[in-house]
Amino acid sequence: MLSNRARLALTDIRDNIRLAEQFASGLSVEALRADRRTFYAVTRCLEIISEAARRLPQNLRNRHSELPWRAIMGAGNVYRHDYDNVAEEIVWRTVQNNLAPLLAAVERELARAPKNNEGYHKP
């Protein structure tokens, strides 16, 4: 059974992937570089995704061993502590190429969880 903590982490990952994709939609890497507000918003989404991934139980991460969990969880440290070296191109490529497989895994986990005690915590 999925714990409430894990369910909340999964919903945070799902919601922030959707936001990052929405914010970066239609932008080239050059446009993202020029739009500091969007760059900061997308980077914050990636930071939340990283932190929420740390809250997932190991057995859940093991079910999705195709995902680079260590890199996902470690990315947040870069966004928080090495923020002056976060490259727009890497953020853009992450949104364009790496979030879809994570979103698919998260949605599978949420779909397999019982619906009766869904602990969604945001409007």
What are these regions (language model features)?
Residues M1-P123:
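Solvent-exposed interaction patches of small proteins and small membrane subunits
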